[in-house]
Amino acid sequence: GWASKIAQTLGKMAKVGLQELIQPK
């Protein structure tokens, strides 16, 4: 459903954000 899709998108964004915080390009 749309809820799981939103959760997936937020999870991806959070993962990317954390990686950028830990290892800034």
UniProtKB/Swiss-Prot annotation:
Cystine crosslinks: none
Subcellular location as annotated: Secreted
KW Protein biosynthesis (keyword) present: no
Protein name in the entry: Xenoposin precursor fragment BM3
GO biological process, any: defense response
Secreted listed as a keyword: yes
Assigned GO CC terms: extracellular region
Family per record: Belongs to the gastrin/cholecystokinin family. Magainin subfamily.
